[in-house]
């Protein structure tokens, strides 16, 4: 993202624009190789500079040093132009045959899985994501496996296959712990907590949400705090513990205020609804 500046190194839109201009204006683009050009494309997209995206794609293609780099450019070009799924599948099949093409093939297959997930074609999503995951296992791409498992977990949840979602989510957690990926852990803990709550194992869900909240507090991630506290409030409400639910929502509201951010309206609406539920019991 380019809309914040903080300890995590994110930059403002103005800073991002200056960086892009420095790297791409005039003859500066001649010093940009294909990998760097591809990394700059998402930034150009966030800045809304479609002409620069096209320039970067053209430059990346002309600067590609081998078939694998050419394949990465083709992948980015297909994505940018909203190509058909068949075109992505064809690219994946072609690049998998290259000596160093497996990471690219896995990435393309993963993208196909995401396209099917967004179209709610869950069986197809599972097929292509699993193919991507098998390649990532072969090349020991642990970070890539995290993404594969996240898609399979989401796919299972959409189909109410919660036991399978729990299996994928647990494996994802284990890999993230080994990678010491704190932000990924925060998100994955909340995902698995949601699955546990759906299965009715509330003690496990509370423990996982609490761990996610602790990480979100350490990372000063207000979105992570919101997800964890909202989940804990859900469980409190399900168990009839409205005071605890209200406490979590109140803490969530204050967190947004502390960060100088507008609190989502559902927090206030839910607090108001819980207050109405709690008030009669206090008067009895």
Model-derived segments and their meaning:
Residues 1-105, 271, 275-284:
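Flexible inter-repeat linkers and adjacent short helices
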Residues 14, 51, 85-89, 123, ...:
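Residue register within tetratricopeptide repeats
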Residues 23, 44, 60, 64, ...:
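Eukaryotic all-alpha helical interaction scaffolds
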Residues 32, 66-69, 104, 144, ...:
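Structural signature of alpha-solenoid helical repeat junctions
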Residues 40, 53, 60, 88-95, ...:
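Tetratricopeptide repeat
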Residues 42-45, 72-80, 103-118, 143-158, ...:
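Conserved alpha-helical positions within TPR/SEL1-like repeat arrays
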Residues 48, 82-86, 120, 140, ...:
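Residue-level detector of the short coil/turn that links helix A to helix B
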């Amino acid at each position: 993202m380019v809309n914040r500046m903080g300890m995590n190194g994110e930059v403002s839109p103005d800073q991002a624009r200056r960086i892009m201009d420095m790297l791409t204006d005039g003859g500066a683009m001649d010093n940009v190789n294909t990998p760097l050009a591809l990394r700059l494309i998402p930034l150009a997209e966030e800045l809304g500079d479609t002409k620069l995206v096209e320039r970067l794609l053209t430059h990346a293609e002309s600067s590609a040093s081998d078939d694998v780099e050419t394949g990465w450019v083709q992948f980015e070009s297909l994505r940018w132009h909203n190509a058909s799924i068949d075109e992505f599948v064809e690219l994946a099949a072609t690049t998998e045959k290259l000596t160093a093409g497996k990471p690219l093939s896995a990435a393309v297959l993963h993208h196909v899985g995401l396209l099917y997930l967004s179209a709610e074609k869950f069986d197809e999503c599972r097929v292509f994501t699993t193919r991507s995951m098998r390649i990532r296992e072969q090349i020991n791409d642990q970070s890539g496996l995290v993404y594969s498992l996240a898609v399979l977990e989401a796919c299972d949840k959409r189909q109410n296959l919660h036991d399978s979602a729990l299996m994928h989510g647990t494996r994802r957690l284990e890999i993230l712990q080994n990678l010491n990926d704190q932000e990924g852990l925060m998100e994955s803990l909340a995902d698995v907590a949601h699955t546990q709550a759906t299965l009715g194992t509330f003690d496990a869900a509370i423990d996982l949400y609490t761990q996610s909240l602790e990480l979100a507090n350490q990372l000063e991630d207000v979105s992570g705090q919101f997800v964890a506290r909202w989940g804990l409030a859900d469980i409190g409400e399900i168990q009839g513990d409205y005071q605890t639910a209200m406490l979590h929502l109140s803490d969530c509201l204050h967190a947004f205020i502390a960060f100088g951010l507008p609190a989502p309206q559902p927090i206030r609406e839910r607090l108001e609804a819980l207050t109405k539920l709690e008030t009669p019991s206090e008067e009895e």
